[in-house]
């Protein structure tokens, strides 16, 4: 059917642009001599994860255990869970995940001795060995052990405990992904992790603690890590390329990132025009995430979106500008793809104005 036959608000992706973005990032990562482990919290759909794997990705990332369960049920067999877990229920779910999918590989990120002890206890009871990756603080001041003795002791604890194994380190600087300016962003991304790689060379390697995997990076910072020591990149948003990432600049343009094309859109409808300079559409905060800024109205110059609450979006434009009428459809480019996907049940794939397929967003709401 034609895209204009969709009920609004609806979430859709330009399938050709998305596929081009997938291929482009894979080639860029290959050219850097790294491997790509895309973060699927961006899309939350096993079928799209499989497209990324088919293009050359070596595995995937998920943010939460719930997303891992969705991806494993969808047939994905190499999954890194990038957020630490705590509590017996979560740990037992991790064990059950291994038991339910014995042919799959799961790596759990941790940053505390508690994780080692509790996961090892549950894994040993189930006759399993769980692979662990240690998160290292890399500037974001979120999770992560400090580089130094604490890191050495945590690695030693894993290496000396049955039921778990040490596979590597995660150093993800999420706070730098949207730094504007290609050179500035890359300089900051490298400088914040240089102490880690110096420590690996000076301390971890001589003690037999060399990480097999060093994972991190994102759509904004992946290019900074060539030759630094990372083995895999966790970029995710590149396949949709939301408005926030478009604004960070690239190697040729200081204000616009043209490495990838904006593919994710929201289709909305004009429902009211109270004044000549104010138009209201049916896309509010329940469908458009605004944590990274306001969405962009596609194809119409001089129009500014303002949230009007849960179900309303307000478009501001010059008075007397006859550009909208009631019932007209408007396309918006979301500012943050990850959280916008979490507002919808369905993602429609569109090609040349036609809906060619649709996916259930299976990982929606799976922050558990």
Describe the predicted segments one by one.
Residues 131, 137-250, 254:
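Active-site loop/helix belt of alpha/beta enzymes
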Residues 1-13:
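Generic N-terminal amphipathic, Lys/Arg-enriched alpha-helix
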Residues 17-48, 61-63:
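N-terminal glycine-rich anion-binding loops that anchor highly charged ligand groups
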Residues 34-35, 205-213, 341-344:
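Flexible, glycine/charged-enriched surface loops at secondary-structure junctions
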Residues 18, 41, 71, 134, ...:
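Conserved, mostly hydrophobic/aromatic
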Residues 188, 220-300:
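Active-site loop ensemble at the mouth of alpha/beta enzyme cores that anchors a bound cofactor
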Residues 273-368:
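C-terminal accessory subdomain/extension
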Residues 39-178:
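Active-site-proximal beta-alpha core segment in soluble small-molecule metabolic enzymes
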């Amino acid at each position: 059917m034609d895209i204009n036959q969709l009920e609004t608000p609806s979430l859709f992706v330009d399938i050709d642009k998305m596929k081009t973005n997938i291929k482009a990032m894979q080639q860029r990562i290959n050219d850097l001599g790294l491997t790509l482990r895309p973060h699927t919290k961006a899309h939350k759909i096993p079928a799209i994860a499989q497209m990324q794997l088919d293009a050359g990705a070596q595995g995937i990332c998920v943010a939460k255990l719930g997303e891992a369960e969705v991806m494993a049920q969808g047939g994905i067999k190499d999954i890194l869970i990038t957020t630490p877990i705590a509590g017996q229920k979560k740990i037992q779910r991790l064990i059950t995940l291994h038991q339910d999918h014995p042919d799959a590989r799961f790596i759990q990120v941790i940053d505390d001795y508690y994780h080692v002890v509790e996961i090892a206890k549950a894994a040993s009871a189930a006759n399993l060995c769980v692979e662990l990756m240690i998160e290292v603080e890399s500037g974001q001041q979120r999770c992560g052990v400090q580089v130094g003795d604490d890191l050495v002791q945590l690695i030693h604890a894993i290496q000396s405990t049955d039921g778990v194994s040490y596979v590597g380190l995660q150093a993800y600087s999420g706070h730098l992904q949207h730094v504007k300016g290609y050179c500035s962003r890359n300089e900051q991304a490298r400088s914040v992790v240089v102490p880690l790689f110096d420590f690996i060379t000076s301390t971890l390697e001589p003690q037999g603690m060399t990480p097999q995997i060093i994972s991190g990076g994102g759509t904004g910072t992946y290019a900074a890590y060539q030759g630094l020591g990372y083995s895999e990149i966790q970029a995710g948003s590149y396949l949709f390329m939301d408005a926030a990432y478009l604004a960070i600049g690239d190697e040729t343009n200081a204000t616009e990132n043209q490495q990838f094309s904006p593919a994710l859109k929201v289709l909305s409808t004009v429902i009211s025009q109270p004044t000549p300079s104010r138009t209201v559409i049916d896309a509010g905060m329940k469908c458009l995430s605004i944590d990274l800024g306001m969405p962009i109205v596609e194809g119409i110059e001089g129009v500014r979106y303002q949230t009007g609450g849960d179900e309303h979006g307000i478009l501001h434009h010059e008075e007397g500008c006859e550009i909208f009428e009631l019932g007209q459809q408007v396309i918006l480019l979301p500012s943050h793809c990850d959280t916008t996907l979490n507002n919808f049940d369905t993602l429609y794939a569109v090609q040349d104005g036609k809906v060619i397929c649709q996916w259930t967003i299976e990982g929606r709401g799976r922050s558990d």
